[in-house]
Design a protein with these regions (language model features):
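Domain-scale recognition of functional cores that engage charged ligands
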Residues: 1-157
Length: 157
């Protein structure tokens, strides 16, 4: 649930606006967040706030009617335990699987380091959904990872 507050946290502690927009996050413990989530359940990704690693997530656009109803009941029973977000399209990358090379959904985690100076590391961690069609990239849910490096070409152009 902390994610919903990140823009406010940045403004409070850094006295500046966030550079990158935050993914819209609805807190089901707030009446307007709960109502929006219930009204748009089939369009949203609904996540438990106390879980990690992709557990307990309902991906509305990919869920059956029964799964959506089960999710609705869980949210209604304990709204303070849930958030929802719009479904974000993940890019795909060629991935080596048992049958050859196939496209799989990926996301990229980049890292910044601060001290006397601040810099962004020249690479990151790409997480990949190894199951065909899956949007869940978490390793605990069968996802994999790849080091990602940004290389500079010193050859003249």
């Amino acid at each position: 649930a902390l994610y919903a507050y990140m823009p406010r946290i940045i403004r409070y502690y850094l006295d500046e606006d966030p550079i990158l927009p935050n993914v819209e996050t609805h807190l089901c413990r707030e009446p307007e967040g709960l109502q929006y989530t219930l009204d748009h359940l089939h369009e949203l990704v609904v996540k438990p706030v106390g879980e990690a690693g992709g557990y307990g997530i309902t991906v509305g656009p990919h869920a059956s009617a029964e799964e959506l109803e089960a999710c609705r009941q869980k949210v209604l029973d304990r709204p303070h335990d849930w958030i929802s977000q719009p479904m974000i399209d993940l890019s795909v990358a060629p991935t080596l699987v048992d049958t050859g090379i196939e496209p799989r959904h990926v996301d990229l985690r980049t890292f910044a380091v601060t001290g006397r100076d601040t810099w962004v590391l020249p690479g990151g961690l790409s997480r990949v959904a190894l199951r065909k069609g899956s949007l869940i990239v978490n390793s605990s849910q069968g996802g994999g990872s790849k080091d990602t490096w940004v290389l500079e070409d010193d050859r003249p152009t």
